[in-house]
């Protein structure tokens, strides 16, 4: 259908602009990052990472880390926050090749996740409102290219993960609810997956638990195959 094709094109445009804006700001501004302090070292330790250098002066920007011995399952399932899931992805792509960990790699993972969320959000909105889809497509890159946002993405702090997972959750919810009824339970599962990642980023995100539960319930009712509209037959 023409509407579906247009919605997909809008979503793809939003995704490309969002990822490009984040990565451009990240790599064009080498000074954006987090400086060393005691709490940052503790955050790294909780993710099986340590400073790549033996001694780093307090106040120096830190991006590079070395890996501690740990199992991937520990990062994925035993980590206190869902930041561990993103760190595990970076570790899987770098550690086997003898590469160290960089928060810039982590920022790229977050950028791709937010690109996915932007695609779902703009795709869903385009099925209902062209104006809303255009606003989302143009507004997301402008908002996310903020140096303050990039600073959190280029760090081990949970704020960066919460931003990425929140956008993925919003995009998945809007996409599911804007599709036709009875579109399939896989979209509800995507919303549930994004919700649990979002809620596990840090304790403060638990205030969104009621909204997450409501979104999952609404998506389940909307996407259930039994809810598909059936054509009326003349008597």
For every predicted segment, state its role.
Residues 20-95:
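Extracytoplasmic loop-helix module adjacent to an early transmembrane segment
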Residues 2-29, 80-235:
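Hydrophobic transmembrane helix bundles of membrane-integrated enzymes that assemble
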């Amino acid at each position: 259908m023409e509407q579906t094709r247009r919605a997909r094109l809008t979503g793809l445009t939003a995704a490309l602009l969002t990822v490009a804006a984040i990565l451009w700001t990240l790599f064009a501004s080498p000074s954006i990052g987090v400086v060393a302090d005691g709490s940052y070292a503790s955050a790294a330790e909780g993710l099986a990472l340590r400073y790549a250098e033996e001694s780093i002066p307090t106040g120096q920007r830190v991006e590079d880390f070395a890996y501690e011995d740990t199992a991937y399952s520990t990062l994925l399932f035993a980590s206190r926050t869902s930041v561990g899931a993103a760190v595990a992805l970076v570790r899987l792509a770098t550690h086997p090749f003898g590469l160290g960990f960089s928060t810039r790699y982590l920022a790229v993972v977050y950028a791709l996740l937010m690109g996915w969320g932007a695609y779902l959000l703009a795709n869903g909105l385009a099925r209902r409102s062209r104006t809303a889809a255009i606003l989302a497509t143009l507004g997301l890159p402008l908002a996310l290219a903020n140096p303050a946002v990039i600073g959190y993405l280029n760090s081990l702090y949970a704020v960066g993960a919460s931003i990425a997972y929140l956008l993925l959750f919003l995009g998945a919810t809007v996409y599911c609810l804007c599709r036709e009824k009875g579109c399939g339970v896989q979209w509800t599962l995507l919303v549930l997956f994004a919700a649990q990642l979002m809620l596990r980023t840090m304790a403060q995100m638990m205030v969104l638990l009621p909204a997450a539960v409501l979104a999952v319930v609404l998506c389940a009712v909307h996407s259930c195959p039994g809810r598909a509209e059936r054509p009326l037959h003349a008597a």
